[in-house]
Regions:
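Alpha-helical transmembrane segments of multi-pass membrane proteins
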Residues: 1-290
């Protein structure tokens, strides 16, 4: 978990930094920084949609990496580098475009005569928006729509903001035409993301990061899969009536309905029974495990 967090944070901060570095001179030279911000918003949304394609294929890439490497210390180092490169490819492009927007909005306000106070205002609203975005994504978008549609929705909102800025700043017919073509591109990219990009639940539940295989056994049947606030949970049933509950592909619990109980089944049964013993009619039960 710590390794995943540091990869995510590194990719995001690096993307923001590189985006800010690139736009540093572009913002000063731009005659209309707000219009440039509109193009950056569209670029951010397109990069987010592209990340869906990378993510959907990441499981096969990890399987190939694990199959090509030996189970040694040096092999693990190469595995870590390979998976880090995949994670960076997923997150950094969209973060790059995100890093360009705040400087452009700041320059726009400064040119409009708002003074240095505009810098604090831009970053304050950015903080508020970040908090609101996390709250909406965690408590509504991902649980209700699932990971794929949640990302597509967020990307579409980004691109919609970009199109609004382009239309607002359009001063002549060529700019209006470019905005119209951009709108068509946004609709096409969104449609392709919904129809072409596939998140295969079987691959996501395979635990490829642990097993090196994206394929469950022939007698396995995926009977439940859902993206939650912080993890994706799956339930797999096998021909011998075993059922496995996995979190992000890692099996956390199993039960054999008709056969001999597994060694940890009493522990799992106790975890379910204890809350019921402590409360007559519980409405919500939280289980914390390690």
């Amino acid at each position: 978990t710590l390794h995943v967090f540091e990869l995510m944070l590194t990719s995001f901060i690096a993307g923001i930094a590189f985006g800010g570095l690139w736009v540093r001179k572009q913002a000063d030279r731009s005659a209309d920084p707000l219009r440039l911000a509109g193009w950056m918003q569209i670029g951010m949304g397109l990069a987010a949609l592209l990340s869906l394609l990378v993510y959907g294929n990441a499981f096969d890439w990890v399987s190939w990496i694990m199959g090509a490497l030996d189970r040694t210390a040096s092999g693990y180092t190469l595995y870590s580098l390979g998976t880090a490169a995949i994670a960076i490819a997923i997150m950094l492009p969209a973060a790059f475009f995100a890093g360009t927007t705040l400087p452009l909005f700041t320059v726009t306000l400064l040119r409009s005569g708002h003074g240095e106070r505009a810098i604090g205002q831009v970053y304050a609203w950015n903080t508020v928006g970040s908090i609101a975005g996390v709250f909406v994504a965690m408590h509504w978008l991902i649980p209700v729509l699932g990971l794929k549609l949640a990302l597509i929705t967020a990307a579409f909102v980004d691109m919609g903001i970009g199109l609004f800025l382009l239309r607002r700043e359009a001063q002549n017919r060529p700019q209006l035409m470019r905005t119209a073509f951009a709108a068509l591109g946004v609709l096409l990219a969104t449609s392709l993301s919904m129809t072409v990009v596939q998140f295969d639940p079987l691959k996501m539940a395979s635990g490829v990061f642990r097993t090196g295989s994206t394929i469950l056994s022939d007698d396995a049947q995926l009977i439940f899969y859902r993206d939650g606030k912080t993890a994706s949970v799956s339930v797999t049933q096998y021909a011998d009536a075993r059922r496995l509950i996995a979190t992000n592909g890692k099996t956390d619990a199993a039960i054999n309905i008709h056969g001999k109980p597994a060694s940890d089944e009493p522990t799992m049964a106790l975890l379910a029974a204890l809350p019921l013993a402590m409360h007559a009619s519980p409405e919500e039960i939280g289980v914390i495990g390690f």
